[in-house]
Amino acid sequence: MAKEHFKFNFEEWMAEELIHREDWKDWYEAMCEILPLWEVNTAERVAMFVAQCGHESGGFRVLSENLNYSAKALNTIFPKYFRRANRDANEYHRQPEKIANVIYASRMDNGDTDSGDGWRFRGGGILQLTGRYNYTKFAEEMDMTPEVAVDYVRTKKGALDSACWFWDSNGLNKYCDAMDIVGATKRINGGTIGLDDRKKHYLHAMDVLGGDFEEPEVDYNQTIRQGSRGPLVAEVQEKLDISPADGIF
């Protein structure tokens, strides 16, 4: 695949403007190869992808989950697994592998704390694929084993492939086409954490890529019925404590 497979003129200088890293050209070449395979191929879709993935990965810098927590942080962030479980956090202070094997044990199809699955299947890629279950599903799509996928998602192509797999599985292109930054954020994050930063990068990306952003209008007089979608639906879902509040009824 190449830049010709995009439905707009995706030039090198655009990637340099959007990815403020010395290896921006490597990311550009990987994007030209991977993104069109998943139909992330219009200015609106690429802008949303770059904005959301850039936010989630610290500007395409973080491809592996950082679990280097202090004992104090463990008791604060993960009280269920430490303080409330009467587990001495001091024994896990700044030991990422031990921490992962506790907080990810016996869920997401992972084995128990002794299995090593928590560390093996910790967050990886720009959207932090996590858990044996998710690695297995992604690996099946890519025709590889979960163990191979663990290493693959920590490469540029693998990070993009895994993010695009998540993107496709969660129907995010429709939010891109509707220019619905709020809906896309909720689908990815489960809420609106970091929305201002995501929107700032999205507007910048739209400007660089030549997209025309228009804030979606919310019709508060509409009747919500099965098949309805959009910001109003998401608001109602939040008020009814329906999770995820993805704007789809």
For each feature predicted by the language model, list its residue ranges:
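Second-shell loop/turn segments in exported
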Residues: 10-21, 35-39, 48, 116, ...
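Proteins synthesized as precursors that undergo proteolytic processing into mature forms
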Residues: 158-162, 169-176
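Alpha-helical scaffolds flanking conserved acidic
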Residues: 4, 42-51, 178-185
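Sec/Tat-exported extracytoplasmic proteins
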Residues: 35-39, 53-57, 64, 85, ...
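Short acidic, glycine/serine/threonine-rich helix-capping segments at coil-helix boundaries
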Residues: 221-249
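Acidic helix/loop microenvironments that form the catalytic cleft of cell-wall polysaccharide enzymes
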Residues: 53-56, 177-195, 249
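Basic/polar, cationic surfaces and motifs that engage anionic cell-wall
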Residues: 183-220
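Peptidoglycan-targeting cell-wall enzymes and recognition modules
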Residues: 2-26, 54-165
